[in-house]
Amino acid sequence: MDIQLTYNRRTTTTTTVGGLSIGSEHPVRIQTMANTSTNDIQGSIEQAKSCMEAGAELLRFTTQGMREVESLSQIRTELLKMLHDGSALFNVVPLVADVHFQSDVADAAAQVVEKVRINPGNYIDPARKFKQI
């Protein structure tokens, strides 16, 4: 079955996540989210490898607190080690921290991964602190 779809893309601006260009004339990107505990470092690495080998271009991890930020740092380090020692059958893709409610966690995660995903609605409570950058 040969299905031809035509559509007009909205005009957007290019942005980059790590070395990956998104938007504008660039192709739609494949993003997935790990379903392992971010603190299960070895399990997360194995799942990341599987996702990247299957073609994922962005990989998101839930990041509830500082412990997960540290785990993400270790995951990133191990994936890069595999790439540099030649044992990887994949290219390391940008990692994304999925953060809710905690601006300090988002700030810390931004030092570790290429992208931090937040829900801005989570930050509207004036009782919560948010650092102006």
Kindly label every feature range from the protein language model:
Residues 2-23, 36-38:
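N-terminal basic/disordered segments at the start of proteins
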Residues 12, 17, 24-28, 54-56, ...:
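Short coil/turn connectors at secondary-structure junctions
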Residues 46-59, 86-89, 102:
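Repeat-based scaffolding regions
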Residues 63-112:
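N-terminal active-site wall of soluble small-molecule enzyme domains
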Residues 99, 103-133:
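Active-site-proximal beta-alpha core segment in soluble small-molecule metabolic enzymes
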